[in-house]
From Swiss-Prot:
Keywords: Cytoplasm, Lipopolysaccharide biosynthesis, Transferase. This is 2-dehydro-3-deoxyphosphooctonate aldolase. It catalyses: D-arabinose 5-phosphate + phosphoenolpyruvate + H2O = 3-deoxy-alpha-D-manno-2-octulosonate-8-phosphate + phosphate. Its EC number is 2.5.1.55. It is found in: Cytoplasm. The keyword Glycoprotein does not apply. The keyword Cytoplasm applies. One of its GO terms (biological process) is keto-3-deoxy-D-manno-octulosonic acid biosynthetic process. It is an enzyme of class 2 (transferase). Belongs to the KdsA family. One of its GO terms (molecular function) is 3-deoxy-8-phosphooctulonate synthase activity. GO terms for cellular component: cytoplasm.
Length: 285
């Protein structure tokens, strides 16, 4: 067993991620649909986050490998996707987060991305976890829909034993019967007890997996309610996907926030985050 412990405060340049600090935003688009759209969404997020003083990391996937249908849009792929993400990083001087699906992808992705993401469905795959941890990049570990919050400790230990202590846990909902996800608010505190920054992926928590027969459905209208509830627990950050026209998005549009609503949405969460983290901590044991 490794003696290494996870970092309570994970640092990325000037950005500090911790449950007691102002929240950090991992935001952008679900999948890279086109380079022009990626630039448009990145610029919108960056401008709004500067106005609201929210630390920001741009998110987009180069491949959606777990689509419901063989005919569903997956993205530009590894080579072109890394190129586009690198262009966004250089043009806007913004840090990048993207997901990795197979062990061979970890090293080349980590050369561009500042944070590499372990997908929820793959979070128990030891070879993938080990390959990602060996890059020494910050790792955002999505909690699988089929795992209890306390089970995330095992994935942290795998990373620590490889020598990587720059770890983040991210809630994205738990399976509740068929085609449904729920978020257990008590799970946030359970994961925070592991002394790692905890994020909330409100976008994918709104999914109804397989709810549209050949693709996932979603409950976009409930995004504000769920985001407020999650952020009220006092978290290190929020994971959010947006689109100018969610109904025309090529992946997970039903769960995406309309880009025109981004600023008022984030302004509310910023105010809530400041309020909650200003409360005196109560000992209720």
């Amino acid at each position: 067993m490794s003696q290494l412990k996870p970092q309570e405060v994970v640092r990325l340049g000037d950005i500090q991620m911790a449950n007691h600090l102002p929240f950090v935003l991992f935001g952008g688009m679900n999948v890279l649909e086109s380079k022009d759209l990626a630039f448009e969404i990145a610029e919108t997020y960056i401008d709004i986050c500067k106005r609201l003083d929210i630390p920001y990391v741009f998110k987009a996937s180069f491949d959606k490998a777990n689509r419901s249908s063989l005919h569903s849009f997956r993205g530009p792929g590894l080579e072109k996707g890394i190129e586009w993400l690198g262009d966004i990083k250089k043009h806007f001087n913004v840090p990048i987060i993207t997901d990795v699906h197979e062990p061979y992808q970890a090293a080349p992705v980590a050369e561009v991305a500042d944070i590499i993401q372990l997908p929820a469905f793959l979070s128990r795959q030891t070879d993938l976890v080990e390959a990602m941890a060996k890059t020494q990049a910050i790792i955002n570990i999505k909690k699988a829909q089929f795992l209890a919050p306390h089970e995330m400790r095992h994935i942290l230990h795998k990373c620590l034993e490889v020598g990587n202590d720059k770890l983040i846990l991210c809630e994205r909902g738990s399976a509740f019967g068929y085609n449904n996800l729920v978020v257990d608010m008590l799970g946030f505190d359970i994961m925070k007890e592991m002394n790692v920054p905890v994020f909330f992926d409100v976008t994918h928590a709104l999914q109804t997996p397989g709810g549209r027969s050949d693709s996932a459905g979603g409950r976009r209208a409930q995004i504000t309610t769920l985001a407020r509830a999650g952020m009220a627990t006092g978290l290190a950050g929020l994971f959010l996907e947006s689109h100018p026209d969610p109904d025309k998005a090529k992946c997970d549009g039903p769960s995406a926030l309309r880009l025109s609503q981004l600023e008022p949405f984030l302004a509310q969460l910023k105010e809530l985050d400041t309020l909650v983290k200003g409360f005196k901590k109560l000992d209720t044991h």
